[in-house]
C-alpha cells in the first residue's frame, strides 16, 4: 500500500513538472522616472527594468535577459551609453548597480564583511549618470535573467 501511495505522488509530481515546463514566461519591462542629485544639479531619467527574450537560430525562445537602464531626459543626441555586464556566476549586476553605477547606492561600512540587509539607501554622487546613460545587464542565470523553454533544465 505504501509503495502505491509513493507511486501516485511520483506521477502527480511528474504531471505538474511537465505542465510547469510548458509555460514559458514572457518578457516584461517596467518603466519609471528617477532623479539623481549631484552637487547642485538634478537630473531626470527614464528608467527601464525588465527582461528581453533571446531566441536561437530556429527562432525558439531560450532565455530572458534581465536589464536595468537609465536614459537621461532632454538633450541626448551625443550622449554616450555605457553597457555594464557585471555579475555571474551566481551574482547579478545588483552590487555594481547599488554600489557605484546607479542613481542610488547602499551604504556599507566594511569592504570585506557586511551584515545582512536592510541597508541605508542614499543618492549616489559617484554615479556616471550625469555624463552617460547606463544599461546594466545580468548574465543568464543571475538576477532577472533565466533560461526558458527547451533550454531550461
Question: How should each PLM-predicted stretch be described?
Answer:
Residues 61-153:
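N-terminal cap/lid subdomain of alpha/beta-hydrolase-fold enzymes
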Residues 1-23:
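Bacterial Sec-dependent N-terminal signal peptides
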Residues 6-9, 29, 127:
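Hydrophobic alpha-helical segments and their boundary regions
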Residues 20-81, 99:
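Catalytic-loop region of hydrolases
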Amino acid at each position: 500500500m505504501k509503495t502505491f501511495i509513493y507511486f501516485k505522488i511520483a506521477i502527480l509530481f511528474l504531471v505538474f513538472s511537465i505542465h510547469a515546463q510548458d509555460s514559458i514566461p514572457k518578457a516584461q519591462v517596467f518603466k519609471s522616472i528617477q532623479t539623481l542629485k549631484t552637487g547642485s544639479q538634478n537630473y531626470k531619467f527614464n528608467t527601464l527594468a525588465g527582461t528581453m527574450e533571446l531566441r536561437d537560430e530556429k527562432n525558439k525562445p531560450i532565455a530572458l535577459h534581465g536589464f536595468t537602464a537609465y536614459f537621461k531626459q532632454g538633450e541626448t543626441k551625443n550622449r554616450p551609453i555605457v553597457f555594464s555586464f557585471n555579475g555571474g556566476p551566481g551574482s547579478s549586476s545588483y552590487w555594481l548597480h547599488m554600489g557605484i553605477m546607479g542613481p542610488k547606492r547602499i551604504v556599507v561600512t566594511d569592504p570585506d564583511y557586511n551584515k545582512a540587509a536592510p541597508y541605508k539607501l542614499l543618492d549616489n554622487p559617484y554615479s556616471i549618470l550625469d555624463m552617460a546613460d547606463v544599461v546594466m545587464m545580468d548574465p543568464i542565470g543571475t538576477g532577472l535573467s533565466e533560461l526558458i523553454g527547451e533550454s531550461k533544465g
